[in-house]
C-alpha cells in the first residue's frame, strides 16, 4: 500500500487538481490587450521557456500559439491566466468549466470572484494576484519585472510589490525559486492550498509567506504545520507589528504551526538567505534543544567580538568549547589563536577559517558556526572563500553537523567573494550581526518545530474538572438573561478547574458579610458584588485590610454612597468578602477570542497597571505544561519569578498548571467568550486568584479551536486471539523512535509492500511526517505493546469524501486479529468523519494483503499500473 507519507492534495472542487495549478502542462492566456498587465503577462509567458503547451486564447500574443476560443484547443488547458475586465471574469470562468479547466490565476480586479468560483467549480488565485512562477518548468505567468532563477525557495505572497522586491534581491544573492505564487486578496484559493502542495513538493527547501488575510484559520494552521514539519517556513505580516493583541495571537498561531515569524523586509530577506540555503541540523537530540549555542571564528578579534555581542543580545549562548576540543584546535590551528569562543585567528591566517569552522561544526556542544572574514593585507580572500564554501558544503551533508554561516566583510572589495559563496550555496552576509541573526533564525526555527510537535490532549489536568458545576453556573446565569458572571461565580468556575482562589464568601446582606468575615478571619477585603462592574477599583467598590466589623460597615457605607453618585441605578447583587491576601507578585491570566484564530490564552504582569505595562505573552489552546512554561518564559515579569534581591522565587510549575487549567476550560466550554484573572497573586508558598471575570457568548454562539487537541479518548485496549494485550491509540510525535525501530524490525518484504520501496531506515523528515499528523485531515493508529509498536494503521483524507489507508503489522503479531481490529478502528473513524469510502493500493504480488482486504469486504480491481491493484470499500 503506497500511501503517501505526506498529506494528499486537497481537492475542494470536482475536477480541480492542485497539480494543474502548480505543475501544469497546458497553459492558456486569456488577456485583453487594453489592460496594461496583459502585455507584461504575455511577454513573461513567451520568454519563460515553458516546457508545456502555451496558447493565447481570444486575443493573439507574440511567442505563443493562438486559438480563437477554448473550443478550438485540442485539449483543455490545465491552467488559465485571466487578464480581463471585471465583467469578463465570470463568463470566462463559465467557459473554462465547460471546457474542463478548473484552475485559474486572476491578476486584476474581479469583484465577486469567490461567487464565480463557487458557481463554476474553478479554483482561482486572486483577485489582484501577482501571478505564478514555476522556474523549474520555465513558467512565468506573473507580473514580475525579471525572470526568477530555479532554486529551492518558495514564496506565497499577497503583495505584488513585495514579490518583485524579493525576486530582485534573490537574483543579486544567487537565490533561486521552486515556486512563486501570488495569493492576492485570497478570495478563493489561498495559503492553505499552496502550503498543502509545498508540504510534498520535493524541490522546495524553504517557504516564505507574505501574510495579510487568512480565510480559514484551522485549514491554514493545519497546512502550515504539515509543511513546517519537513522544511523551514518563514512568515511576515506587515502593518500590524506590536499594535494589538490580534498581532500577538497571529504570532502565537504561527509559532504553534512551526512557522518562523519575522518583522520587516530586511529580516524577511535575511531569513530567506539563511533558511533558503542552510539545512537545519538533524543531529540526535537537536530537535528538542534550544539550538542557540553559537560558535564564532574570525580572522580578527574585533569582528568576532561584535558577533558574540550580537548573539548575547539576541538571547543566544556562546558555545563552550570542551577541553578535548581545545586540544584538537591547538593541533590544527596556528599558534596565537584566541583559545576561546569567539575564536580569533592570528594575522595572515584567514585561509584557516574553513579548517576552524569544520572542527567547530563537528562538536556536539555547537548548534551553529559563524565564520567571519575581514579584508586583510597579504591574504587571498578568494582562496579563503573557496575553502569555506567547501567546508560548509561538507558540514551540510547528512544534516548531522552544525551549519556554517559566513560574514564576508567589505562593501567594496568583498563583493566577488560573497557572490562566489552564494553561488555555492553558502548563507553569506555583509556584517557579523546579520550572520548571527541568521543563526538565531535557525535556533528559533528549531524551537518552533518543537512547539509544533507538542500535541496537548483534551485531558491534561492532574485533577478532573467539575464540569457539571460549571455547566450549572452557566445555566443559572443564562436563565437570568445574563452573559456576564459575577466575581463569586467566576471564582467558582476557576476553582472547578483546579486554579487556587482566595478564601471568600458571597453575602446578600451587610450582616451576612460581617458573619462571613468572622468565619474567614480578620483582616478581610470587601467588594461590591456585581456583574456590571468590570473595574471595581475605579469606582471605589473595593476596601482592603478591614480589621473588624465596624471598619467593614464603615467601608460598606462609603461604597454605597460612592456608587450612588458614580453609578446611579446600579443594583449590586450583594457583597464579596475575601481573606486579606499576603503580598506577592501580581500576575494576569486572560482568555480571549480572536476573529481569525479563535480562543487564545494570555499571561503577564497583573494589577491595575497591566494594560500600561504591556508585558503579556499569548498562545492558543490547548496547552500542556511545556507550552505553558514557554509562555511564562516569554514575558519580562518571568525574570522576577526566579527571585530578585529580597523577593523569593515563585513556582513556575504552579503558574503553568493554572494556565493549563484555563486552557482546559476553553476547550471544554467553547461558549465562553472571555475570562480575565487579575490579579493572580503568586508567592513562594503558593498562589491565589483574587479577582476574576468571565463572559459568555450570546446564546447560540460558540467558539472554534484553531488547533485540535490530541484525541486521547480514541485509545482502546485490545486482546489478540492468543491472549496478548495491546493499546491501540492515535499516533503521537514522541512515537518517532518507536516507529523507526518498528520499521527496522518488520521483515524487509513487508516494508516493501507497505512503502513500495525496500526501506530499512526511515529518514528523520519521513518519521516526522508519519508521527506529527493533523488529526483533522488524517488518522494514524499505533498498537502499543509495552515499549514497542506492534502495528500501525493510517487513513489520509483525499478531499473527495474518501480516504486512503495503509496498514503494517509486525510479523510476530500477525494472525491474532490485530490487523482486522485496526482496520475496523480506521473504518469507525472514517464513518464518524462522514466519509463514504476508503481505498488503498496493493502490490499485485502481495497475496496475503489481497486476501485480507477481500475478506473484510473490499473490492479490488486493476489500476493503470499492472503491478498495482486498487482496493476500495464503500462505507
Model-derived regions, located:
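Long, contiguous binding/interaction regions
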Residues: 701-875
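Catalytic-core regions of core metabolic enzymes
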Residues: 2-691, 695
Amino acid at each position: 500500500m503506497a500511501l503517501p507519507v505526506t498529506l494528499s492534495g486537497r481537492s475542494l472542487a470536482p475536477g480541480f487538481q492542485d497539480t494543474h495549478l502548480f505543475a501544469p502542462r497546458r497553459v492558456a492566456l486569456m488577456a485583453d490587450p487594453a489592460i496594461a498587465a496583459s502585455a507584461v503577462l504575455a511577454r513573461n509567458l513567451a520568454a519563460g521557456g515553458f516546457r508545456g503547451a502555451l496558447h493565447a486564447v481570444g486575443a493573439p500574443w507574440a511567442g505563443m500559439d493562438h486559438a480563437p476560443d477554448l473550443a478550438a484547443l485540442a485539449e483543455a488547458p490545465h491552467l488559465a491566466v485571466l487578464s480581463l475586465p471585471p465583467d469578463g471574469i465570470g463568463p470566462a470562468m463559465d467557459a473554462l468549466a465547460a471546457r474542463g479547466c478548473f484552475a485559474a490565476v486572476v491578476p486584476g480586479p474581479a469583484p465577486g470572484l469567490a461567487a464565480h468560483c463557487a458557481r463554476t467549480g474553478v479554483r482561482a488565485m486572486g483577485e489582484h494576484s501577482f501571478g505564478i512562477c514555476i522556474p523549474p518548468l520555465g513558467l512565468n505567468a506573473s507580473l514580475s519585472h525579471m525572470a526568477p532563477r530555479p532554486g529551492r525557495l518558495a514564496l506565497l505572497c499577497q503583495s505584488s510589490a513585495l514579490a518583485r522586491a524579493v525576486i530582485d534581491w534573490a537574483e543579486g544573492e544567487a537565490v533561486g525559486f521552486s515556486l512563486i505564487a501570488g495569493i492576492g486578496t485570497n478570495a478563493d484559493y489561498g495559503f492553505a492550498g499552496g502550503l498543502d502542495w509545498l508540504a510534498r513538493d520535493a524541490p522546495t527547501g524553504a517557504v516564505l509567506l507574505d501574510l495579510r488575510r487568512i480565510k480559514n484559520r484551522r485549514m491554514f494552521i493545519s497546512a502550515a504545520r504539515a509543511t513546517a514539519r519537513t522544511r523551514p517556513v518563514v512568515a511576515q505580516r506587515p502593518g500590524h507589528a506590536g499594535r494589538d493583541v490580534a498581532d500577538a495571537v497571529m504570532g502565537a498561531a504561527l509559532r504553534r504551526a512551526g512557522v518562523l515569524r519575522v518583522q520587516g523586509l530586511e529580516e524577511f530577506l535575511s531569513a530567506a538567505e539563511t533558511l533558503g540555503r542552510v539545512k537545519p541540523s538533524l543531529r540526535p537530540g537537536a530537535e528538542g534543544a534550544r539550538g542557540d549555542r553559537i560558535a564564532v571564528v574570525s580572522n580578527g578579534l574585533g569582528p568576532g567580538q561584535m558577533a558574540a555581542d550580537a548573539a548575547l543580545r539576541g538571547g543566544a549562548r556562546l558555545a563552550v568549547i570542551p577541553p578535548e576540543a581545545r586540544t584538537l584546535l591547538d593541533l590544527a590551528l596556528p599558534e596565537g589563536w584566541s583559545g576561546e569562543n569567539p575564536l580569533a585567528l592570528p594575522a595572515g591566517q584567514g585561509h584557516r577559517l574553513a579548517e576552524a569552522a569544520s572542527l567547530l561544526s563537528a562538536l556536539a556542544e555547537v548548534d551553529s558556526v559563524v565564520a567571519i572574514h575581514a579584508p586583510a593585507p597579504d591574504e587571498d580572500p578568494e582562496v579563503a572563500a573557496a575553502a569555506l564554501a567547501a567546508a560548509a558544503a561538507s558540514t551540510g551533508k547528512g544534516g548531522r553537523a552544525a551549519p556554517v554561516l559566513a560574514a564576508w566583510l567589505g562593501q567594496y572589495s568583498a563583493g566577488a567573494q560573497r557572490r562566489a559563496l552564494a553561488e555555492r550555496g553558502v548563507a553569506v552576509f555583509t556584517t557579523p550581526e546579520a550572520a548571527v541573526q541568521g543563526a538565531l533564525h535557525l535556533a528559533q526555527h528549531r524551537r518552533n518545530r518543537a512547539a509544533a510537535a507538542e500535541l496537548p490532549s483534551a485531558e491534561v489536568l492532574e485533577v478532573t474538572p467539575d464540569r457539571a458545576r460549571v455547566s450549572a453556573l452557566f445555566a443559572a446565569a443564562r436563565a437570568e438573561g445574563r452573559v456576564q458572571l459575577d466575581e463569586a461565580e467566576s471564582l467558582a468556575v476557576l476553582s472547578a478547574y483546579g486554579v487556587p482562589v482566595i478564601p471568600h464568601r458571597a453575602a446578600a446582606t451587610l450582616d451576612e458579610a460581617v458573619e462571613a468575615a468572622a468565619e474567614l478571619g480578620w483582616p478581610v477585603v470587601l467588594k461590591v458584588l456585581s456583574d456590571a462592574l468590570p473595574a471595581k477599583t475605579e469606582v471605589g467598590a473595593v476596601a482592603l485590610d478591614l480589621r473588624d466589623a465596624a471598619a467593614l460597615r464603615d467601608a460598606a457605607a462609603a461604597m454605597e454612597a460612592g456608587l450612588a453618585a458614580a453609578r446611579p441605578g446600579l443594583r449590586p447583587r450583594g457583597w464579596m468578602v475575601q481573606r486579606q491576601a499576603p503580598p506577592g507578585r501580581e500576575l494576569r491570566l486572560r482568555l480571549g477570542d480572536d476573529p481569525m484564530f479563535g480562543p487564545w490564552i494570555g499571561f503577564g504582569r497583573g494589577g491595575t497597571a497591566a494594560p500600561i505595562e504591556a508585558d503579556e505573552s499569548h498562545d492558543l489552546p490547548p496547552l500542556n505544561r511545556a507550552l505553558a512554561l514557554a509562555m511564562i518564559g516569554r514575558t519580562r515579569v518571568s525574570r522576577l519569578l526566579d527571585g530578585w534581591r529580597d523577593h523569593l522565587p515563585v513556582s513556575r510549575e504552579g503558574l503553568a498548571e493554572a494556565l493549563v487549567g484555563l486552557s482546559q476550560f476553553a476547550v471544554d466550554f467553547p461558549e465562553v467568550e472571555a475570562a480575565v484573572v487579575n490579579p493572580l497573586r503568586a508567592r513562594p508558598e503558593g498562589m491565589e486568584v483574587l479577582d476574576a471575570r468571565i463572559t459568555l457568548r450570546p446564546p447560540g454562539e460558540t467558539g472554534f479551536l484553531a488547533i485540535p487537541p490530541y484525541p486521547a479518548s480514541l485509545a482502546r485496549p485490545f486482546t489478540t486471539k492468543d491472549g496478548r494485550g495491546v493499546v491501540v491509540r492515535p499516533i503521537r510525535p514522541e512515537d518517532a523512535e518507536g516507529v523507526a525501530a518498528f520499521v527496522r524490525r518488520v521483515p524487509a518484504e513487508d516494508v516493501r509492500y507497505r512503502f513500495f520501496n525496500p526501506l530499512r531506515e526511515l529518514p528523520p523528515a519521513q518519521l516526522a511526517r508519519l508521527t506529527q499528523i493533523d488529526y483533522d485531515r488524517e488518522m494514524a493508529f499505533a498498537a502499543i505493546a509495552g515499549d514497542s509498536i506492534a502495528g500501525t494503521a493510517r487513513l489520509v483524507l483525499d478531499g473527495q469524501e474518501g480516504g486512503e489507508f495503509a496498514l503494517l503489522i509486525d510479523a510476530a503479531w500477525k494472525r491474532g486479529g490485530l490487523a482486522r481490529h485496526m482496520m475496523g478502528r480506521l473504518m469507525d473513524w472514517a464513518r464518524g468523519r462522514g466519509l463514504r469510502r476508503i481505498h488503498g493500493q496493493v502490490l499485485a504480488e502481495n497475496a496475503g494483503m489481497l486476501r485480507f482486504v477481500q475478506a473484510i469486504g473490499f473490492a479490488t480491481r486493476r489500476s493503470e499500473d499492472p503491478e498495482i491493484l486498487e482496493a476500495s470499500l464503500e462505507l
